[in-house]
Amino acid sequence: MEKMTRVSTINGRTMFCHLDAPANAISVCRDATQVVVAGRNIFKIYGLEEDGFVERLNLRVGRKPSLNFSCADVMWHQMEENLLATAATNGAVVTWNLSRPCRNKQEQLFTEHKRTVNKVCFHPTEVNMLLSGSQDGFMKCFDLRKKESVSTFSGQSESVRDVQFSMKDYFTFAASFENGNVQLWDIRRPDRYERMFTAHTGPVFCCDWHPEDRGWLATGGRDKMVKVWDMSTNRVKEIYCVQTFASVARVKWRPERRYHLATCSMMVDHNIYVWDVRRPFIPFATFEEHKDVTTGIVWRHQHDPYFLLSGSKDSTLYQHMFKDASRPVDRANPEGLCFGLFGDLAFAAKESLMSAPASAGDVGRKTYPGGDRRYPIFFFKKPDVTEQFAQVSSALSVFESEADSSAGMDWFINTAQSYLLSGKPFAELCEHNAHVAKSLNRPQESTTWTMLRIMFSEPANPSLSTNHNLNKSGNLPLVNSFSMKEMSGALNERNKENRQDNIHSLETNLNNNDENEETEGSEGQAEYLFVDDELDDDELYSMEHDNQPAEESEYLLPQEAFPLRHEIMDHPSAPEPLQEKQESPHVSGSEAESMCLTPMESFSLISVSQQLFSPHLPPKFFCPIVKEMLCYYAEQGDVQMAVSVLIVLGDRIRKEIDELMQEHWYMSYIDLLQRFELWNVSNEVIKLSTCGAIMCLNQASTTLHINCSNCKRPMSNKGWICDRCHQCASVCAVCHHVVKGLFVWCQGCSHGGHLEHVMEWLKQSKHCPAGCGHLCEYT
């Protein structure tokens, strides 16, 4: 009666409120009337009323901002309504007492962790016990009546992602780790964990004990899996596995529903899903209100399955009502379709759809529920809905692809093996990858690589870049001279190489003398002269001259033919002048009479050594469209192209794309490479990645579980002796001692030993040192 009374008092609807900043975590109080929202820049308490959320208290007080307010997690005590705990990004664990009369509600500060604290958890029945897990790999248990931790737990592993006290076992808590392991601890024994098992491939981000079933523990990881483990037996057993759409950041069991749990993702997917673990491939319900990553979920009351609270990076706080959730099952296609790794197609449907009627008379015939027409229908009991669901059978058809079919995945393998991602200049990488895509009949990808080379290649002559400014007086250069002969030759050379699409003019030198100013140019049959950028094509003049010996008379060119230009202030149609900051050349009165140019000095007139404008747009100009292109490829499922371009472009585009999105692309591509057993390519992608979570994939420790060679029992991690037969494992066949370093064995007879001992033995004899008579060979 007490439970029903508490549930009946909870009323509400689907509602939301805007927050001041993105939320990292949320927690609800015991009576489900208030919720606390914590993040890097927010720490507030909101009241839950029928009309909406009402701000009750802002816990970020003080003139100077403190990192103690920058929260990675928050927990509201379920026995003491005025007590909260937060995990700070600076490694501090802070408790808050809402009953304090002053504005600052901070009560205790624990600074024993050296890195960010990821999780804090109160004991469900012990008021003064608080547990924390940190990036430093340690878990600490605090007694709130003391100023220091009472015990420290070292998992001998990487960072701790989540810690949860068991709802049924007073002394037990579970911890999930970055390396994919889950450990069970007894708070009375801080020296060693009680049990450890590998739950996921990759980090385990979250875990949650079932509120009713004593031994059920749900875990979620980066491998997009939610797994339910049975801890009540001597050996950990996986009983359910749910395949989600993205990495699982939070998992919470649904109250009053044994097989339901809620999950949210830490990247890509913004929705909240409620799963029935008995039907793991399609969500039972979906909440689609958030526009960015959901960071925290909590059921409003421990006995109410109809209200779910959530916070997100979109700076919103939502209360979801279960009747407003969308039901994917209602819209789902009852037939299944799936492509295999090598292009094979599998199709599953009900047997009634896959098999044709036996005869024409069977069409439209209805059968009795019991299936036997010898008895009246009232003798048969209508089957339960769950039984009907369990008894449904499907037929599976597999269509194998031909070897030369376009549906095959040979193009993926050949592309992964042929692409160059590093080791050469950027232009050569793009050109090589374009040829690879073209040879594999992928014209769109080939064109993409070619366009990337054009957009992001640097000019061949760095002196003609756009990093030049106006001179001090603000004047534009008077004349820019081009040698068409040299330009044509350069273009022909570039067309042969097919490497550059830029037009570079001949760089000239400006020499200043005391008496006059002369400009040396290159020889040519024709010189095209234009002043600034204001002349049209029909205003260009061609001046021809013949190469004459140096000893002939000089050409006298009147200065008044080229009057000095006035200062140009602002001209919207003219490009930005590209002249270095220096004073404009000044022509004195005596120098204004004439200027002397010799034939050997060409017919180039007063000019500058830089172009008026660069033929290249800055690379940042193309970043938005390249970002859209990468997202397009990823949405189409071609993560190979997205990741390859991301690696080749490097810092040119990396900052434009969200790091979590990059991590999702990398993980998807690496997963595909490993499915095709392209281990070398996978390792290269990991090494070239700039995401921290990806770079550490090939640096994680590798655990090899071995069995006893005598009784075949799995070896424990307590030593090198089998617990059952008391025989040593991995004994060297030569020296008969336990091998604790490099171990080499024969694949024919399975005998082996120390690497050095086996090498020395096989130099003298070809027979196995164990005496089995096998002819062993060391290669």
UniProtKB/Swiss-Prot annotation:
Residue segments, region Disordered: 506-526, 570-590
GO BP term (any one): cellular response to amino acid starvation
Cellular localization per UniProt: Lysosome membrane
EC numbers: 2.3.2.27
GO cellular component, one term: lysosomal membrane
Family assignment from sequence similarity: Belongs to the WD repeat WDR24 family.
Zinc finger (RING-type): 730-779
Protein name in the entry: GATOR2 complex protein WDR24
Keyword Membrane assigned: yes
Zinc finger (C4-type): 707-729
Protein residues bound to Zn(2+) 1: C708, C711, C722, C725
Top-rank lineage group of the source organism: Eukaryota
Primary role: Catalytic component of the GATOR2 complex, a multiprotein complex that acts as an activator of the amino acid-sensing branch of the mTORC1 signaling pathway. The GATOR2 complex indirectly activates mTORC1 through the inhibition of the GATOR1 subcomplex. GATOR2 probably acts as an E3 ubiquitin-protein ligase toward GATOR1. In the presence of abundant amino acids, the GATOR2 complex mediates ubiquitination of the NPRL2 core component of the GATOR1 complex, leading to GATOR1 inactivation. In the absence of amino acids, GATOR2 is inhibited, activating the GATOR1 complex.
Activity regulation (UniProt): The GATOR2 complex is negatively regulated by the upstream amino acid sensors CASTOR1 and SESN2, which sequester the GATOR2 complex in absence of amino acids. In the presence of abundant amino acids, GATOR2 is released from CASTOR1 and SESN2 and activated.
Native organism taxonomy: Eukaryota, Metazoa, Chordata, Craniata, Vertebrata
Repeat (WD) residue spans along the chain: 66-106, 112-152, 155-195, 199-239, 243-285, 289-332
Gene3D superfamilies for the chain: YVTN repeat-like/Quinoprotein amine dehydrogenase
Organism the protein comes from: Danio rerio
Binding site residues for Zn(2+) 3: C746, C749, H774, C776
SUPFAM superfamilies hit by this protein: WD40 repeat-like (SSF50978)
UniProt subunit comment: Component of the GATOR2 subcomplex, composed of MIOS, SEC13, SEH1L, WDR24 and WDR59. The GATOR2 complex interacts with CASTOR1 and CASTOR2; the interaction is negatively regulated by arginine. The GATOR2 complex interacts with SESN1, SESN2 and SESN3; the interaction is negatively regulated by amino acids.
Keyword annotations: Autophagy, Lysosome, Membrane, Metal-binding, Repeat, Transferase, Ubl conjugation pathway, WD repeat, Zinc, Zinc-finger
